[in-house]
């Protein structure tokens, strides 16, 4: 619910993930085969006190063959073959099956100890959408021991997901696939245990798929015909070891312009400024940390008249890993430590100070 729209609904979901992997290593090549089966199901109760509900269910089979061959010490070629079949059913559709096949080739060439490049092509075939031939290109050049410059260019394509198309009460079956062309240049400075990265990026998108909150309180996906994203990202990280004690600090800042080319206005709910910082202390299997996150103001109307204020949040946490070769992680967090009153969507107040206890098992 929201401040202006009351809600008495309930949402239940149940998901499973199962995967098998076979790996073969030889002198000049490696071969990996993965098979995964995923199930996703949800029930939505408009009235949580009623037994009446709508539902959606997707069962997906994923197959992948990853083959890597070393032509020489400086050249490798990597081929990827992917197959996905998803069967969906739900209250808003009888049955829907989507089959996707993908082939990719990636060439990597290390010209010297300082300079390398890579080239890739990718073709996706579906029974629903016509996909263009996609490409990627990248290079990395270490000008000095402390400074490396990197550049990447790629053409991308994304088809709407089942949730985009058929989510109960919110899906949009008329969505078009999203096309994009993006490039970035990164400058990486490193010294001992510290690193600073400055990245500039530019992305041109056609039919961008975005979920937008509507006046009735529901989020719905739509295409925005032409969008330009550009900006800067900065990252700094450092760490210091004293015996078995490890201290680490990471901070980042991003400035993003995401503009509708027709209106020349910033897209709704995309902040110009985002920043975060993380300070952590580790001793053997014990870790404690402090997190700080800042989100700048966002516009809530396409004419950029209405907006939500910026906010900053703090979290603290502690965890202990009981495993040695495996992960058995028990942790506790205090979220929104300062009890900040904020909204990241209009009329939807976010939780105040709250607590989280978690157990992570990696068998």
Report each predicted region and the residues it spans:
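Flexible loop and strand-edge segments within Gram-negative outer membrane beta-barrel domains
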Residues: 1-60
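Residues on the lipid-exposed face of transmembrane beta-strands in outer-membrane beta-barrel proteins
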Residues: 18-24, 63-69, 105-109, 137-141, ...
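Transmembrane beta-strands of outer-membrane beta-barrel pores
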Residues: 26-28, 37-41, 83-89, 99, ...
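Gram-negative outer-membrane beta-barrel transporters
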Residues: 112, 202-204, 223-299, 324, ...
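C-terminal beta-signal and adjacent terminal beta-strands/loops
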Residues: 204-206, 297-300, 318-363
């Amino acid at each position: 619910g929201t401040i202006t729209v009351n809600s008495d609904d309930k949402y239940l979901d149940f998901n499973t993930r199962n995967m098998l992997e076979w790996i073969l290593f030889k002198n000049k090549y490696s071969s990996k085969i993965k098979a995964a089966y995923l199930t996703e199901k949800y029930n939505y109760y408009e009235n949580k006190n009623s037994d009446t509900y709508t539902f959606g269910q997707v069962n997906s089979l994923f197959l992948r063959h990853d083959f890597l061959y070393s032509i020489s010490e400086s050249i490798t070629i990597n081929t990827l073959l992917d197959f996905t079949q998803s069967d969906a059913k739900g209250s808003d559709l009888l049955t829907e099956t989507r089959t996707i096949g993908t082939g990719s080739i990636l060439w990597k060439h290390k010209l010297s100890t300082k300079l390398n490049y890579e080239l890739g092509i990718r073709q996706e075939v579906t029974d629903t959408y016509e996909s263009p031939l996609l490409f990627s290109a990248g290079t990395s050049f270490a000008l000095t021991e402390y400074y490396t410059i990197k550049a990447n260019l790629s053409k991308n394509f994304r088809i709407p997901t089942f949730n985009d198309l058929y989510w109960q009460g919110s899906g949009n079956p008329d969505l078009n696939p999203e096309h994009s062309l993006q490039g970035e240049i990164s400058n990486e400075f490193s010294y001992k245990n510290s690193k600073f990265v400055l990245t500039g990026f530019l992305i041109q998108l056609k039919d961008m798929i975005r979920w937008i909150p509507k006046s009735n309180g529901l989020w719905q996906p739509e295409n925005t015909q032409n969008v330009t994203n550009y900006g800067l990202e900065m990252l700094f990280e450092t760490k210091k070891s004293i015996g078995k004690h490890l201290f680490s600090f990471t901070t980042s800042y991003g400035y993003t312009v995401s503009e509708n080319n027709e209106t020349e206005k910033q897209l709704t709910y995309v902040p110009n400024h985002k920043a975060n910082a993380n300070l952590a202390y580790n001793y053997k299997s014990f870790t404690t940390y402090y997190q700080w996150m800042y989100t700048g103001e966002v516009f809530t109307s396409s004419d950029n008249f209405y907006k939500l204020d910026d906010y900053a949040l703090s979290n603290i946490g502690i965890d202990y890993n009981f495993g040695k070769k495996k992960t058995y992680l028990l942790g506790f967090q205090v979220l929104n430590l300062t009890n900040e009153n904020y909204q990241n969507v209009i009329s939807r107040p976010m939780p105040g100070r709250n607590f989280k206890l978690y157990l992570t098992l990696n068998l």
